[in-house]
Amino acid sequence: MKKLLLIPAFMAMFFAGSVAAPATFAAQPAPPQESKMMLPPPKDGKRPPMPPRMRRPQLSNAEAAEKLQSAYGYRYSDMLRLLNIGHSYGDMNTACLYAYLSGEPVEKVLQLRQPATWGRVRAQLGLTPKLYAEKYMEYQASYLPADSPVDRETALKYLRQGYPLGDILQAAKLAKESGKTLAQVLPMRTVTCDWEQVKAKLGLQQEAKQDHPFAFRGRGQRSGAGFAGLHTRNMTAERAVKIFHADYLFDEAELLPLYEKYGFEGLEDICLHAYMSKKTLQEIIELRDKYSWERMKYVLGLTPQVYFERCVDYQARRLAERMDIPQKVTKKYMHMGYAMHHINSAYLLAQKAGLDIKDVIDLKTPKNSWQDVALKIGLTVEDCREVKNKISKDFGRHE
């Protein structure tokens, strides 16, 4: 089989936009591990400046077409033609994946994309969370790297047990080097034990640790709450505990010592999995030593469809509590593929204009802004700013 193109992590998370949670069954995005580097400790009360954003080298259209052909099996000439008429490599990569998974032509997927978000496109293609996950696992197993240490059947077997492909391939490599079996090595990687630690346990040579002083997760922004923009830099314990209590409903007295032990991102992961699985925080903490986050979802019964439905319930509750948006409205539109923040903005603008959300929500496209939408429905720039400020205030952004 052709070598697998590295697909952005969010591609495997069907419900990206529902809750930007750490990982799912195929990948997403790569799940946050405890071994990730966080913000370096402050010196003299000050943190170093944020690092510049790293940009990928630009691909020529010919190079991009070759990658797409290799990843999905589409004709090189067709890929080059679509790139040459203005479609970006990023959009083409996503469109090819969705076309492959749905069985629809790439051109149809690109046409659906013009006025809509990718979440909406997935819904229009009939790619439910369950179907998306099943098809994506089959895709991963069919397009293994040329030097893959596992075959298609083995990869698919473990993918269906909640292990991400990267872990399966790494475990197979270490199993071969250590004389162990894949089944023995794969479960060794957990939330609290990364692959370098697994190597040490197996008596294998470890890679020299490199200093990554600016390896930030989310560039100092929150990554697990279904919206962007909440700054986690300079977070205080008091503020963090209030955020987690409001979002996940756990007791503040229980959250405080856990925040002091695990930090913001570590506790976010714990709260998210506990809330979605309806378990206690302590139960999830104990599972961290046994499973990776991806595998834990499988063990907890959080299939892609179940996880998505609970994400919908979660966001519907939050929008009802903070924005007075009826839960049935949020649930209806999230099931149609609209992201929570999209529903939020559309509903508030519609209210200001005396319209129904259905008359507003599709006016927002990938090529315009909510300010453009506001002006189109007879509102002013100030009206749009008021909506934006209300969302920021009620969700604690940029504090």
PLM-predicted stretches and their roles:
Residues A27-E399:
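General marker for long, soluble alpha-helical cores
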Residues S18-V19, D394:
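Residue-level signature of transmembrane alpha-helix interfaces in integral membrane proteins
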Residues V19-A26:
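Sec/Tat signal peptide C-region and signal peptidase I cleavage site
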Residues P8-S18:
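Bacterial N-terminal signal peptides
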Residues M1-L4:
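Positively charged n-region of N-terminal signal peptides that target proteins for export
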